[in-house]
Amino acid sequence: MGVTRYVRATGLGLGLAASVAGSVGTAAETAPAALQGAWLQQSFSCARVYSPAGKSVSFIKPVNAFAPAFIISGRRLRTPLASCRIRSVKPGADRQVLALDCATTVAANEVVAFIAPMPDGTLSRFADDEDRIGTPYKRCFQ
């Protein structure tokens, strides 16, 4: 499996489907308040994936590499296997487009993620800009 494919499959594909993108910006941005927090695919238990510690939250040790989960905190987005810097957040027609610089233990890559806050407080993650269904995520901690 190639490095780019590995990053997609294990780094972000485990909780945040994304696709490789070109350079979008240079200054890191803080994600909007509606996106901040620990997110988990709705069919999973927050208590089995996250460990709250005061005002912060982290992944339970040992980390479940396959958990469909991510944490957005300030200018950072973390999955069980990747840590990303949010370069920019741009509004799309019905979703936010996040340009990310991500790193795993084996590679670093530029990635784009498509997410949208929903009226019911959940978040939908989209595979690309043509995905109309999305995958719902619940907020475990803010």
Task: Cite the ranges covered by each PLM segment.
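Bacterial N-terminal signal peptides
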Residues: 11-21
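Edge beta-strand at a domain terminus
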Residues: 127-142
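Contiguous, well-ordered beta-strand patches that form the walls/edges
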Residues: 69-119
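Bacterial N-terminal signal peptides that target proteins for export
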Residues: 2-13
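N-terminal helix-cap/turn-to-beta initiation motif at the start of protein domains
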Residues: 26-40, 69-72
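Short, solvent-exposed loop/hinge segments that bridge or flank secondary-structure elements
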Residues: 40-75, 79
